[in-house]
Amino acid sequence: MARRWQVEQLGGDSVLIPNGVDTARFRKAQAPRAEDDERPLEIVFLGRLDEPRKGLDILLAALAQVQRPFHCTVIGGGTPRHVPNVTYAGRVSDQEKAEILGRADIYVAPNTGGESFGIVLVEAMAAGCAVVASDIEAFRTVCNADSAEPAGLLFANGDSADLARSLQQLIDAPDERAVLQQRGRERAAVFDWDKVSEEVMRVYETVADGTKVHMR
């Protein structure tokens, strides 16, 4: 949507620069699981519990269908739903959020819409999580979903059964999960402030000297 609007309103020579995210805190928080670690896989959700478009109830419905051991940590304010294997952390500091994501195996973003970007997806990727996200345009972009090597696993928007299948797929396939985690780390680097600030400076420089911008 952002790129289409850009071309229609600003012309084909305009340049789209991604949002910048401070990923350093999340990179440092990574705590990879040891090979002999037999704890259930850790799944994390972050969002306002009482806002339907954040998709918590979609996630909880999916978790009820997962026939594998897991634990889920829910971050965010609102009214908890007391279901098995789910812990509510409430509102947390940025450092606490980084530590929770750094310990997690999978981050789930079941949002149904109204998202212009997906900062927390980038944060989760930087922290080493495999990202599972609803198939909405903002998340497709962050996950580089149309590339040969997507950095996230998308499920049908609002479909708890499809989300359950995606989660079970990653729980059952540690190698696939590890590939997504590595791609996520690499994808998060694209949105890091250091990288984005370089692109901004390149745009300023090319505007100043009149040359055409080619984003890397």
Residue ranges with predicted function:
Residues 1-16, 21-25:
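A short, active-site helix/loop in glycosyltransferases that binds the activated sugar's phosphate group
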Residues 98, 121-126, 137-141:
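Short alpha-helical segment that forms part of, or immediately flanks, the ligand-binding pocket
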Residues 169, 193-216:
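C-terminal alpha-helical cap of glycosyltransferases
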Residues 35-54, 60-64:
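Conserved donor-binding/catalytic core segment of Leloir-type glycosyltransferases
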Residues 176-190, 201-202, 206:
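A short, well-ordered alpha-helix in the C-terminal region of glycosyltransferases
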Residues 76-99, 106:
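Nucleotide-activated donor-binding/catalytic signature segment of Leloir-type glycosyltransferases, i.e.
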Residues 6, 145-160, 169-174:
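Conserved acidic donor-binding segment of nucleotide-sugar-dependent glycosyltransferases
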Residues 106, 130-133, 140:
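Short hydrophobic beta-strand element within catalytic cores of glycosyltransferases
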